[in-house]
Amino acid sequence: MEIKDLENKIINADCMDILKQLPDKCIDLVLTDPPYNASNSSITCADKHYSTINAEWDKNFNPIPYLEECKRVLKDGGSMLFFCTYHLLGTYLNWNGLKLQQVIHWQYTNPFPAIAKVYSPAIEYIVWYSTPNYAFNKEFAKTNVILNNKAYQVDGGKFNHPSVKPSDLIKKLLLVHSNENDLVLDCFSGSGTTAIACHRLKRRFICIEKDPEYWAKSVERLKHEQAQMQLF
């Protein structure tokens, strides 16, 4: 399969199956939100429903094989950005396959309430690895703390996903760590936000989602986005 056949598509597959088909050093930026090993049930608080993660795919996840395979397909001059919570942060920090450049803190002001005798979590981490001569557009980067509300739903509640990332957050990361026409890989594309942000910012993308329901809905989101863009 030619890499051109995969570009600008959201693919319904196990990402490892697709990664193994990609040639070495073909990706400019890996930007992805893998499982967290943080499974729990959803909760209802007052008039709000907060969907937390409670799925088999979020249990016993080992990021190392994915880090290794993403490293293989990353170009010289590329970066990898992996979202995580404290559950797996140590694993990411201890991996030495690429230079650990920095840990970015995404702090949100609307966390869901704590369901145990602990603080409400209001931070997720973005672990940034790089190769030499990586892209870094400093005009879009201020500090390694990004303030942005957490998204619990997209498209007015039509698409519920337990780990939705706000489009503004993904756009900011793309602006800092990539350039127009770069090829971006998202191995766990979920609600399709990376694909949509890439489309808006003129980045090429390969997005992969294993869950058929999330995949189908994200493809519809992307089609709607593409249709809207054609109107202008």
What are these regions (language model features)?
Residues 1-216:
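Core catalytic lobe of class I
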Residues 1-5, 219-232:
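Short, conserved SAM-binding/catalytic segment
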